[in-house]
Structures are given as structure tokens and as C-alpha cells.
Amino acid sequence: MGRTLNCAIGVHSVVSRARAEKGTRVVFVDPRMPEGALTGSKWLAIRPGTDGALLQAMLNIAINEKLANFDFLAKHTNAPYLVTADQKPVTEAMLREGGRANYFAVRDSVTGEIRFQGMKKNEAGEFAGFDEDPSTKADLYFAGSVEDAKGNALEVKTAFVVFAETCAPWTPEKAASVTAIPAGEIVQLTRDFFTQGGVVDDGWYGSRNGNDSEIFALICCLNVFTGSLDRNGGFVVTQGAGMKSVSASYAADKGQGKSPTGKTWKQEGGEKKALDKVLYPESSGTYSAIFDAIETGKPYPIRATFITGSTMFHREANSDRLAKALKALDLVVVQDILPHEVMDYADYVLPCTFFLEWHEYAGVKWHINGNVQVNDAGIDPPADCDAREEIWQFCEIIRRAWPERAAERLSYDKEIKTREEFKKWYYGMVDKAWNKFIAGLNEKKPGEGDRVAADVAKQGWSCVKKKAFDVFPYKKPFGTMTGKPEILSFLVATKYQDKGLHPVPQYFIPKEVYQQPKPNSDEFYLVSGKDSSSSSGVSMFNRPTEFLGDRSVWMNPIDGERLGIETGDMIELEALHSGVKGRAKVKLTNRVIAGSLFAYSFSGGVRTKTIKDSRYNWVREGINSHWFCTGYREPVVGGLSNNTSVRVKRV
């Protein structure tokens, strides 16, 4: 849903093999047809931001037609757990004097008794299994009253009942009216999904329409309803190899860090959270959270920023807001290898290195098995270019500002002036960590580390651990309050309901995200996405991208005919909320849903003044869709809206 599988290295080949060898069917749900849907796959064109309506309709069908795995829901999720009228969990402490606050109430469907379930911990506080009476037949469908610890009646329902009630209004017909996917297609898609071992990809990043966190939660719920969680062929947790790369770590909640050599240190007053975590506590990184602090100095002043290898103007929605923030800072330092637009705002540009110039051992991300790999420097930077690894630059800056901190926290106690010195220092730590990892494998199983080391030396990678299925949540817990998949989030119910999130994930579009375009008019959704060759911060400057890249704006022929616009025409796009304007050539194609425009991200609209070579003027062609965005951030999680709405005219 909303993802092209062609962009991530290896994913497309895995899908291609599955189709060829297993007959796997692939369905893409997207406002535009991605490259992966061009041959042998199905494309369901959906209105932007309405994925949640489709998902709730599919879940509603799965419940009504008994397609879901109800035994799995009763045993391995919080579906049978009781919740109050405000959807908060019913705990043992609420129903029994002296009861436990982390044990949750379920009703036995045979005896009618209320029983309590929770996670057992050993003396070290580690998970030791789920504390559940095996004879309990947890009731998914209970709704009624129970007696609390003070003898009062408490109205409750199971999380499943609340979930089903939330999905019930979403009939196939209602979802069709919202998504533009025919009702019959929705019904058939659901039946095929549940009867043919379906899995929904859990996405690449959720930054589209201001409702993405709940859409991804619904995607997870759909996978959970199949009952194939962490089972072969199902929605799984990847294995991990257990390889720890060289790094300096910092635990903000404890104000404590660890140097690359393992030495711990304490930061006085360091328990304070980063600003994005204050404003968006479940965020994994919301850069624009600092913008208000830059302007107002509250809750504390921010006067400088380092930007490391990030194409900020092609990543950060609302380009004008970003530019204003950068201009207001006293110091902007950019570490990069290419002339991205953010350099126009930099006081210092530090030329860094590229992965082809690095030496490192690491785990292989996003692979089902626990693999490790080596990256060996194939080249060095040119002799007349003082390019350095970002870590080298950071270490030297910290050494000059706080030499004692550099020594204590980074094990960097003197200036390193040459690349050979850096290799000896840093690569020495890299190799030491690798040798320790190999020795640890040999200690657990004689010869195993030697096998892995030989594999890596010969082919560049090795499988350390094959995926162990049936682990989560059967033997190990998830990081939820119950340790199980939660179809009604107890974290949201207890902490974030008043912040704009829903305990039961559901479809909605925030009013603030962007103005909804009028249908059959000159107003459109503007959506963006990547292709498989040119949409990245590096390849957008490659000479082949001049010919392989597409810097046009796609429009459906139905819309083109209505507006008198043809392929090759120049159009002006104007943001509905701000009036920001940009121009690009049009391509009429049935690969985008009517009422929406599509433009490749990380592709065109580079406005930098640093490029002097006229051979690269083509990078300025087209638009950057972030020019037109509101920059709306989801509450609590801080996800940005990359999609927006515009008005169009031919010029």
C-alpha cells in the first residue's frame, strides 16, 4: 500500500522469484501505478489518504464473513481484554483490592468468570512468559457489566467488540465512495487476501496525508487478523545477526552514554529529552519540531544545526518554512558530497566521504535472516580533496571545543590529521569489534565464527542466524503494554486519546493537513513517490538521470481533456493553502488516478545556486512537491504530510 517495491535493493528480486516460483500474486494500492505494477501485478487506484477506509472495510468483511482467525485473536492478541466505556484497559487493580495494575481482565466464555492475564518476569526483570490459565476460553464478544473493587458496576466490552463496532460502518459500498475502488473489488480483494495467505507490506515510511500512523496500525491489524504473525509465509519479525558496530551511544532518559571502547560517562542535566521527543513523544525523528524554538527561543533557544548527508529540501515538507528556519540560525554546517539546495544556507560545507570509500562490518538491514556484511573501501577520496568521514569531522570539532569530552566519550584524545592516521584509529576499532563478534560465535559453537568470517572474506556476507519462526508473541513479547499485538492500543488509550490519536486505529483526514480539492475542477491532490533509478539524493545528480529521470507532472487524460491540457504543455501549480507556485511540463497518463497529480520525489526542482556547470541545468527542471506542502505534523508521532493540494492552469 503506497509503496513501490522497485526502490529497495533486493526486494523486487525477492518478489519476482516468489511470483515465478510460487505463483504469488501482488496487488499495489496507490494513487499512481508504480513500476512494480507494470507487468504481472494488479494496480488498485485509490484516492490519496483514503487507505484507512479500504482497510477498515476489509477488516469489517473479514469479521462478518468469518475469514479472520478468531482463535488466534483470542489467544495471542488483546482482542478479548476488557475495556471501559472510554476504551481504557480493565486491570486487576480496578476489580480486586490489592490487584496488579499490569494484569488485564478477560472473561471466560464457558464459566463466565473474570480472569487476569499478564507477563511473568524473572528475578532480573526479564520476560519469562505469559501468565495465563491454559483452561481459559477467552470471550471475544462480551459486553456487559462487571463489579469493581468497591462493589460498583462497571460497564465493559472486549477490545474486539469495540474494534468490530468501529469497523462496522465501513461497508464495501461506503469504502468505494471514499476510495474510488469499486465495492466488488474490495470484497474480492478481502476474500483472496484471507484465503490465499495474504500479507500487507508494512511500508517504507509514513509521511503522506497526516493520518499515516493509524493507517499503518490498520495494516498491522489486517496482518494480525490472518493469524500468521511471525509464521512462515506470514507477517514476520526479522531475525537480526547480533552484530554490534562501533559507535558511541547515549541514553537520553538516563543522561548516560558509552564510548566506542565501552567506557560509560554521565552528562550533567542530560536526562532532558530532545525537543522532538518533548513535542512528539513517539517520534523517531521530527526535524521541524525545532522550527518554533528557532523563531521564539522557547522552550529553549536553538541557534545552530548540523545537517549530515540529508537532502533537506527534498525531505522536509513546506520548503518556505525550512528556509525561514535556516536563515534564522547563527550557524549552519552541512556535511555532504553533492551540491544540495541546503548548502545555499550553510555557513560551512564539510566535504564528506561516500560508502565506496568506507570500511565497515554491519548487519544486513530488512532481511528476514540474520546476515552480516562487509563494506570494503574500493577507492579513496582524490588526493587534492580533504574529504573525511562524518564521524572524523564530528570528533575533531568536539575535540577542539571540548577536548576532555572527546577523549572520554569518543576515545578521541588527539588530532588526527591524515587519512592513514584515521584508518589506523577508526578502522582499528571496526576490526576489533568484528574479531570480538567472530570470537563470540566460536565460543558458542566451535568453528561457527570461522565459517562466518570465511564467508564474508569470500563473498562479502554471511548468514549468522536463519529466521526462527513462531517467536513473537509466542515466546517473546512485543513492546506493547500487554506484550501482545494490540488491536486497541492500550498505550494510546491511557496516554494519547486527548492528543488526537485513536485507541482503535481508524480512517480520518485531519482538517489541518491540506485543503481537500474540489472534484472535477482545476484543483488536484498532489502526490509524490520514488522510482527505481533516479529518485534519491545521490542519483538525482547523476548524468544518466538527465535521460532516465522523469521531471514532469503526471495527469490523468480525463483531467487533461477537461482542462484542455496535453502532454508537453507547461502548467503552473499553485498551493491551495499558501499560494506558492511552481511550473513543470505535463505528461498525460493513465498511471495516475483522475483528480490527482503525481511527481517523482528526489528528482527535480533543485533550486541551488551552487551548481555552476551548465551541463547540470536539467536538475532545476520540474517541481519539488514539498514547495506546496503545509508541513502538517501528526500529533504524538510527528509524521509529516508530504502530499498536498494545488490549483492548475496551462501557461
What are these regions (language model features)?
Residues 356-382, 393, 398-403:
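Glycine/threonine-rich phosphate-binding loop and adjacent beta-strand/alpha-helix elements that clamp
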Residues 75-78, 192-193, 235-246, 410-430:
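A glycine-rich phosphate-binding loop feature that marks nucleotide/adenosyl-phosphate handling sites
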Residues 40-41, 196-197, 302, 329, ...:
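Short, well-ordered alpha-helix to beta-strand connector turns
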Residues 378-379, 387-447, 538, 543-554, ...:
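Long, contiguous, secondary-structure-rich segments that constitute the structural scaffold
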Residues 21, 34-195:
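Long, well-ordered, tryptophan-enriched scaffold segments
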Residues 70-76, 178, 188, 201-206, ...:
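Short coil/turn segments at secondary-structure boundaries
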Residues 1-28, 53, 131, 136-147, ...:
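Extended redox/cofactor-interaction regions of prokaryotic respiratory oxidoreductases
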Residues 1, 39-40, 155-156, 169-173, ...:
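Flexible glycine/proline-enriched surface loops and loop-helix/loop-strand junctions
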